[in-house]
Amino acid sequence: MKRSNTKIMASGPITSWEIDGKTMETVSDFIFLGSKITTDNDCSHEIKRRLLLGRKVMTKLDSIFKSRDITLPTKVHQVKATVFPVVMYGCESWTVKKAERQRIDAFELWCWRKLFRVPWTARRSNQSILKEISPGISFEGIMLKLKLQYFGHLMRRVDSLEKTLMLGRIGSRRRRGW
């Protein structure tokens, strides 16, 4: 373990940590396996970060989307295969609130509008764009499907801590008055 590169993050009352007399640097967030972990366990930062990464991928594919040689269904498949997975990485553990849901819907429609090269000033309804693309299932629907698949995966496991936590069967007694 290299002390100069090692940092700690604590979600409890621990404020500092010493190893061999040297205090370790404390951080409030870090990226672990591609996901942003914060001390307050709020996933809104991670959702915003993922949406920004999706925007970067979408803008890098701009030359493909402007090409007249590629058909619209191929472009739609390209978005679903390259942009959406970048955004949805780790979405099974997200707690999506109303504000994040609106951001996700806005991102999906931004992708489709960029695909059609419809400027934001154009008076074209979102429904007409969705009707023309006919994506089948919305971005939010895909995320819900992934969450349910993960939940089913957890429930099929025989003796796992995750299943016990999800079902609320922790073997302890409640304190009086709780």
Residue ranges of each PLM-predicted region?
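Short linear motifs embedded in intrinsically disordered, charge-biased segments
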Residues: 1-178
